[in-house]
């Protein structure tokens, strides 16, 4: 049974990824920061799609290193190591730089960048020691590649994710573990719903529309296939042709 952890999978892109991987036969371990019921609902949906036993959803704050380690170590002690991890969960706290407060900077960096370390540190060595030729996919963003007005903190964090992915991919390549990033553009999620002038944003996208969570999930699912075993250290953009 190939178990895959998908963080932030109670809604949005994370849930779409979880459901798509379940359709491909993976036993998906769902996760939420707070909403345990929603995460377990995702886990139940995944079990129906995959035909695999329903996995207990995990609940932890990625910025809390001790809590992340405790939850993951307990899960692996009971169920074994993961075949793959999709690091999707993240936060944003947008503001123009002159009024960007230190707390908003810390919140985003601690969750979106340091949280990636907190998540992967407990799971990578069990993958290596069990000779699992697995998959790690981290969600970055168009902001992490090109930057975005009002998102200095978020852009910095997501750029850092790309750097971490590229370095970790080199370290794990000889183990057969691939490490890649997927960088969505504007996707139809709760975050996109807060855009003040959506039509202006749509006109800036060559395809003249926002992407869907399912389109992002399809790219992640490809990276989990056997055919993608030679794809590592890459950043795949899903942005409708923004650049």
Regions found by a protein language model. Give the residues of each.
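Residue(s) in the substrate-gating loop at a strand-loop-helix junction
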Residues: 141
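Conserved glycine-rich cofactor-binding loop
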Residues: 10-12
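Active-site helix of classical SDR
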Residues: 120, 157, 165
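Substrate-binding pocket helix/loop in short-chain dehydrogenase/reductase
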Residues: 96-97, 101-109, 201
């Amino acid at each position: 049974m190939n178990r895959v952890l998908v963080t932030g999978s109670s809604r949005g892109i994370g849930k779409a990824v979880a459901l798509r991987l379940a359709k491909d036969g993976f036993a998906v371990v769902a996760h939420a920061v707070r909403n345990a019921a929603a995460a377990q609902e995702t886990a139940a949906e995944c079990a129906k799609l995959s035909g695999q036993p329903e996995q207990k959803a995990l609940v932890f704050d990625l910025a809390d290193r001790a809590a992340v380690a405790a939850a993951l170590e307990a899960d692996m002690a009971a169920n074994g190591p993961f075949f793959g991890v999709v690091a999707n969960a993240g936060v944003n706290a947008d503001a123009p730089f002159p009024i960007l407060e230190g707390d908003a900077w810390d919140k985003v960096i601690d969750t979106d960048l340091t949280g990636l370390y907190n998540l992967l540190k407990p799971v990578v060595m069990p993958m290596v020691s069990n000779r699992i030729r697995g998959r790690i996919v981290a969600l970055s963003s168009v902001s992490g590649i090109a930057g975005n007005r009002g998102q200095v903190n978020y852009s910095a964090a997501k750029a850092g994710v790309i750097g971490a992915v590229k370095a970790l991919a080199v370290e794990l390549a000889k183990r057969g573990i691939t490490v890649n990033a997927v960088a969505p553009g504007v996707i139809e999620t709760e975050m996109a719903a807060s855009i003040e002038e959506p039509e202006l944003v749509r006109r800036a996208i060559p395809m003249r529309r926002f992407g869907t969570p399912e389109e992002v999930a399809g790219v992640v699912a490809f990276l989990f296939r056997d055919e993608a075993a030679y794809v590592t250290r890459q950043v795949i953009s899903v942005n409708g042709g923004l650049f």
